[in-house]
């Protein structure tokens, strides 16, 4: 963790309606491991326009962005990277000398992961979940040339996500899935592991 903060410390923040300590602990631990004089602070903004203006005004180096602000920050920043433009959702803002650029690192990470492992585009995919990260994952998989099924208990968001990218929707796990991606809040407090995880049988039938 951070041992001290001084006038040379570079500040990064997260903007979230309900900030948690998970990201704070991880970022500050990683800064310490890398020997960086950075400090990460979670913030629940009362006014998102003023919060984004504060990134510029206070020379904050970057910001993580969570719901419900991922779309709201887009008109407030200077540039939107293709990763964020694709799904109209920003999860990271980088401040370069007062110029704010928005990225979606979920989309970028999945895209790079698929390409670096040369994943077979013929594999049928099952994505469990239909929230904000699921949208980034489904978009990245679609752009890679793959398709499949959105598996979600919430029929409204599940159907909407599936239709947007030309996927199937099912509340139940499809038997033909060869690649599994779990983007539920599995592992977080209050989640149901039995409902949100893939079964041993489902994992056993899959290739990836």
What annotation goes with each model-predicted range?
Residues 2-117:
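Phosphate/diphosphate ligand-binding glycine-rich loop within oxidoreductases
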Residues 163-207:
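Rossmann-like adenosine-cofactor binding region
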Residues 102-107, 114-143, 152:
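Glycine-rich adenosine-cofactor-binding loop
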Residues 143-165:
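NAD(P)-binding Rossmann-fold cofactor-contacting core
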Residues 63, 125, 180-181:
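Receiver (REC) domain switch-region micro-motif
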